[in-house]
Swiss-Prot record:
Gene3D superfamilies reported for this sequence: Fe-S cluster assembly (FSCA), HesB-like domain
Family classification: Belongs to the NfuA family.
Full protein name: Fe/S biogenesis protein NfuA
Cofactor or coenzyme needed: [4Fe-4S] cluster
UniProt KW Transport keyword: no
Species this chain originates from: Shewanella loihica (strain ATCC BAA-1088 / PV-4)
Subunit text: Homodimer.
InterPro entries: Fe/S_biogenesis_protein_NfuA, FeS_biogenesis, FSCA_dom_sf, HesB-like_dom_sf, NIF_FeS_clus_asmbl_NifU_C
Amino acid sequence: MITISDAAQAHFVKLLADQPEGTHIRVFVISPGTPSAECGVSYCPPDAVEADDIELEFNGFHAMVDEKSAPFLEDASIDFVTDQLGSQLTLKAPNAKMRKVDADAPLKERIEYVIQSEINPQLASHGGNIMLVDIDEAGIAILQFGGGCNGCSMVDVTLKDGIEKQLLDMFPGELTGVRDVTEHQHGEHSYQ
């Protein structure tokens, strides 16, 4: 469920040494499965352990995960990185905003998952996003751009060289192309 690097495990052991005996860590997601999902790590004293918590054993401590957060922490990783600027704990949870779908889920659900977990985070750097409207009988994903992508002069390049290429590579034989149905209007909201 959660991978914690050796460096992060050593860091947690050091932090927990200053806490009351029996204190572990809690890894959680606030508003899981939503665009505003936030992940966190906190101390978990013995009296804060819930009956339905999932207990993960690590080197010198345990990590508690509440039942509601668990599916959104699949494939999560925690690392402790040190560089010339200092050190920091990093938590990456690719499924926090949307639960990972099974490989045999309907094509629409699998494409929606890729859009939310991989494509939209890239477009967000320009204030943009895309939404899957439908998949037609010919296997073409109908997409609609929003935010900074609406009216952007580079939208065709983003669509064909970025999004379409990525989706066709991920869904060969199932998807035949993508089509933009956005009524683009260049304005102050547009990226370029």
